[in-house]
Amino acid sequence: MSLLFSRCNSIVTVKKDKRHMAEVNASPLKHFVTAKKKINGIFEQLGAYIQESASFLEDTHRNTELDPVTTEEQVLDVKGYLSKVRGISEVLARRHMKVAFFGRTSNGKSTVINAMLWDKVLPSGIGHTTNCFLRVGGTDGHEAFLLTEGSEEKKSVKTVNQLAHALHQDEQLHAGSMVSVMWPNSKCPLLKDDLVLMDSPGIDVTTELDSWIDKFCLDADVFVLVANSESTLMQTEKQFFHKVSERLSRPNIFILNNRWDASASEPEYMEEVRRQHMERCTSFLVDELGVVDRAQAGDRIFFVSAKEVLSARVQKAQGMPEGGGALAEGFQVRMFEFQNFERQFEECISQSAVKTKFEQHTVRAKQIAEAVRLIMDSLHIAAQEQRVYCLEMREERQDRLRFIDKQLELLAQDYKLRIKQITEEVERQVSTAMAEEIRRLSVLVDEYQMDFHPSPVVLKVYKNELHRHIEEGLGRNLSDRCSTAIASSLQTMQQDMIDGLKPLLPVSMRNQIDMLVPRQCFSLSYDLNCDKLCADFQEDIEFHFSLGWTMLVNRFLGPKNSRRALLGYSDQVQRPLPLTPANPSMPPLPQSSLTQEELMVSMVTGLASLTSRTSMGILVVGGVVWKAVGWRLIALSFGLYGLLYVYERLTWTTKAKERAFKRQFVEYASEKLQLIISYTGSNCSHQVQQELSGTFAHLCQQVDITRDNLEQEIAAMNKKVEALDSLQSRAKLLRNKAGWLDSELNMFTHQYLQPSR
């Protein structure tokens, strides 16, 4: 089944090819039509391609995110190519095959044109002489019209007589004027194939041959010299074509010996006359003009009767016999000669027109396509090089980012451990120094000098100033002992941090790191708050005899227990509770289990209680002592006791009170300051930790800025690589498209411009 289908397709294809070949064989002018259609299509594609390339290059040149991969000169060049291609496309759209008919007046130029068109399009015959250039072209409309030179007005023409009348009525027309006669294609099939026929005034009536050639002949593909077979070639005719040959390289020239039907009246001289005309025309074409060789000359010289052909074709068009009417003998031979002329003319003009009209533009199109291809290739290479550079830069930044992250993690662990060691050392130094300063507190208090008075107002001021003195003195001494070493250690640590993190920063920031990281002079704040710490200090500067009962009890028991003993609070002495529940079966604890301190307090308390109950106790005791030692010893003892009391009472001055006050304050303040040694050491270590942590955090902030910049650069590189990938792909596509257009132009050249072997 598939084989049958393939054979059917082959048969259809063969039939189509045969039909196409038949059309080409039937009308060689189709060669130009198909070539024109092909080249117009190629130029349309070329224009679209250059438009796309120009837009692409302009967008690429304006893209500020990419480094320059194209130049403004390249953009302008491609835009220039676009305008050139558009201009060529407009020229190609107007291109057509052009044949120019020249000859002396009344040689039958218009009749030849009418015969070729199978209709009486141009005025001809007796009384009708062409007085200007007539350009006959086809129009898709159904009405004929004419256009005069310099005017866009379409003048309607329905018949040949109207055309003749219009041409003769226009007084502005002269021999060098051009009138375009647009005839419906439906009436003249020859005009459908982009063929333009140009009739001219007789070349024997003007001397403006040079201007005619420049104005009307330079774009002609074929020249037809319509000669009168009843006479030989005139010098005027030869002179004109000599000028044409000087302006154009090897012009295509046909010679029609018209009115050959007159030879039928003298048949005995026909061949001799034909031979003479052939020799002279061949000599003119070959020897004088050099446009053909002798082998080709026979295909350029014809003997016809245009009037007979026109009459026969008009009759045939009207449905009458072709040979009807009064026709001279040999009509069929002359008809065949005219048809042979038409065949040779069509083949010549189609080949010549394709070559002259399209070859130069084809070469120019190839040059433009190649130029744009080279631009796209250079852009592709530049984008590829930039992409490789971006990939290398991205890899470098990614490696840098990984190095920063790893190094920052290691440094953070190391600095965290070192900060911990430094803070512990600071706490130890401050605690040791403060303990030593507390032991020397009495010296600091003794250095305090201010007028002392026991009045409450003066004492309040005295204590406030003493607090300030202690605060400043302790702070100064601690600063002298600790601050310098701690500050030096802190600065060393900060410099180590800077040196460790500096390699993680970009080179531009390394020299500015000292300005970026604040380096304030660090000062420890000990913050002892002596005024609040000693706010509840209660001095005792009343006179107390050293051998008095209260002082003795205080000396043995201490201030706290003596107060309890003297006030009779023995019942409030707390026994320690047993750690286990009491067991009735167990014997009570022995009395000796009481502590020695509790026993002493109990005894003295009992004694004091006894003496306080009755004065008789004193008498009893005194009597007992009296009996034991005698009155003299007692009297002496009381005398010495009294003298000692008087001495101490007299020496209890303001200075003594101040010394007692300072001694009491030293004891009290020392006890209080001992409580905050650990707190002060921790506070100082916390300050150092905050300072070092702040420095490290600020350095890390700069590193984070560097990391963010690297991440942004990596993201920008990724975006740039994507843009370059797209750019490369587009440039490669456009480069390949230029190659495809070049292959299309090569195919066109091979098919239409190169001579067939």
UniProtKB/Swiss-Prot annotation:
Region G2 motif, residue ranges: 129-130
Positions of modified residues (Phosphoserine): S442
Binding sites annotated in the UniProt record for GTP: S106, N107, G108, K109, S110, T111, N258, R259, W260, D261, S305, K307
Region (G3 motif): 199-202
Domain Dynamin-type G: 93-342
Key words, A-Z: Apoptosis, Autophagy, Coiled coil, Developmental protein, GTP-binding, Hydrolase, Membrane, Mitochondrion, Mitochondrion outer membrane, Nucleotide-binding, Phosphoprotein, Transmembrane, Transmembrane helix, Ubl conjugation, Unfolded protein response
EC number: 3.6.5.-
Post-translational modification: Phosphorylated by PINK1. Ubiquitinated by non-degradative ubiquitin by PRKN, promoting mitochondrial fusion; deubiquitination by USP30 inhibits mitochondrial fusion. Ubiquitinated by HUWE1 when dietary stearate (C18:0) levels are low; ubiquitination inhibits mitochondrial fusion.
Written domain comment of the UniProt record: A helix bundle is formed by helices from the N-terminal and the C-terminal part of the protein. The GTPase domain cannot be expressed by itself, without the helix bundle. Rearrangement of the helix bundle and/or of the coiled coil domains may bring membranes from adjacent mitochondria into close contact, and thereby play a role in mitochondrial fusion.
The protein's name in its UniProt record: Mitofusin-2
Organism listed in the record: Mus musculus (Mouse)
Gene coding for it: Mfn2
